[in-house]
Amino acid sequence: MVANYASMMYHNGSNILGYGVLRLLQYNEQLMSGWESTMKDDIGYWRRFVHDFYTEKGTFRYNIDYKDSPNQEPKLFELSYAALPRFLYLSYCGKLKKMSFLLGNTKEFAIPNNGYFVESSRASILYQYQGGVQVIVSGHLRAHFFRAPLLKLDSLEFSAVGHSEYLLRELMTNASLALSQSRPPQNQIQHDGVKSEDPSSESVNINSSSSLLPDSPVNEYGLEPHIMRFMEITETISGMRDLIAFTLAQRSGPTSALHKFATALQQQHQMQKSTSSNIPYANPAPSGFNGSPRNGDVASLASNYRYAKQPPTMPANAISQANRLLDQNNIPNMDPSILPQSMPIASVPPYSLQGIKRQGTHSPMVEGENPNNNPNFYSSDMLNAQKRTKV
């Protein structure tokens, strides 16, 4: 098999395709051998296994979404690098004899940094249990390998869409034979020449045949109950990772750390909210604007542009105050074309320009002058109140 895959390799840029599939086959081979007596109860073996095939940030995601069973809600489990050895150890501590991946329609892609992405759209996980029970979970597999320096799994994801449970033919034959030998003579009652079977005998036969077959080791999701429980607990602990790290850093009790953690989250949320509120917007709408400036303030230029069809009315004292602030004799660069015709010039709020010369810019009123050559182009009395200028 290795030779066949080696012959399929070809050079594509800086990466040679085929290494990702080979590494996945090595992973599958060592995963199947976990039931051996020397490794079954050794969690150290699984720690070495995870260290050899996963990066320190590697994860295993198991998604369950049965389209044919709408009553079963979708589930998503994510196992981190630290939880993977315990997961594999518990899997083989039960009735499981062998666990392996079956790949179908496998594709491999080279990614930057000498990595590989392997995808199998018709993949399956094969579980073989003691007693002759076999469970096949079908789904979709995605594997992302990262070279560090050997190829290791940065993420392994399996999306289950259904499962099937199988029994050995030998078990079915033995159960049928035992049932036929233990069956009492047919309890038939004859009434007027018509034979009728006892209805209770059919239910007894069904119960007897079910008792002779081994029990199902998996639940409705195709997982063993204790493995399902472990994955649920791990998912909960993974969501509390920040709280656990905060508790260890504070060296306080659970209750005190929980209150401090909630306070820290609130402060962080308030800081983010205040930071986002200080970001200027291009055309903000004034709060409480109903057609006139609030509290007699001078309307902003952005508000005038936004409500140009209905220019705001201004009190007389505001207009006189604006007239005192704006001395039109000191604004030679004023271009009234940028203002709405229906809005008085006095309603434009003052703003000041920074005393920085604009390189290569000419005044629209004096075309021939260059501000770099004329030191009096921006006089000190012109920097108090300026109008917007078209350039």
UniProtKB/Swiss-Prot annotation:
It is found in: Nucleus. InterPro entries: LIM-bd/SEUSS. Disulfide bonds: none annotated. Residues 201-211 have a biased composition (Low complexity). Residues 180-217, 366-391 are annotated as: Disordered. Residues 180-190, 370-383 have a biased composition (Polar residues). GO terms for cellular component: cytoplasm; nucleus; transcription regulator complex. It comes from the Eukaryota. Keywords: Cell adhesion, Nucleus, Transcription, Transcription regulation. GO terms for biological process: cell adhesion; negative regulation of transcription by RNA polymerase II; positive regulation of transcription by RNA polymerase II. Pfam families: LIM_bind. One of its GO terms (molecular function) is transcription coregulator activity. Belongs to the adn1/SEU family. Probable transcriptional regulator involved in cell adhesion. This is Adhesion defective protein 1. It comes from Schizosaccharomyces pombe (strain 972 / ATCC 24843) (Fission yeast). The lineage of its organism: Eukaryota, Fungi, Dikarya, Ascomycota, Taphrinomycotina.
